Amino acid sequence: MPRPTPGKDWLAGHRTEAAADRILDAAEELYTQRDADSIGMNEIASVAGCSRATLYRYFENREALRTAYVHRETHRLGRAIKQQIDGVDDPRERLVASIIATLRKVRDSPALASWFSITRPPTGGELAGQSEVIAALAAAFLNSLGPDDPAVVERRARWVVRVIISLLMFPGHDEADERAMIEDFVVPIVTPDTVNSARA
């Protein structure tokens, strides 16, 4: 696919959101090739077909761009996973299904999977572990499983994020093995107390 030529008309006909997405798409293309830490703003601007000045108008530095990319993909994954588990009613089964779906979708994306490769710097794990957006989405999902103390839900959400990061970086033998670990060691701790009490 031919790349656009940098110029003053780069934003012509583009809204701000569309222009930012175009830059993030360019970054994604590069993320599939090399680890994120080795990719500079010059390269991203070149692939996006815009000037450095335009790039910095949207993202003040590389860290801001990477964070924006992770958050965009998090929202996309969230919507896809929500649709996938829509027919699962049992809270415990929904939790397992959502984690398995998250692992599968990240691994199926070359750009996202590269962030969690143990042969590269742990950029993906660090960003995911520190992201308030990811933590908030995880907390909202856990809260949908059943009511519980907000502080407890927040801690459980951060724990789930760490479990997912761990499995992405250090996978189980196969999906069945990972499912068993989630059922044995995550579900009993993370599902709301009301759900566990009802199952007792």
Predicted regions mapped to residue ranges:
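Short hydrophobic/aromatic patch on the recognition helix
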Residues: A48-F59
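Amphipathic C-terminal alpha-helical segment
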Residues: R104-D108, N143-S144, R158-D177, P188-S197
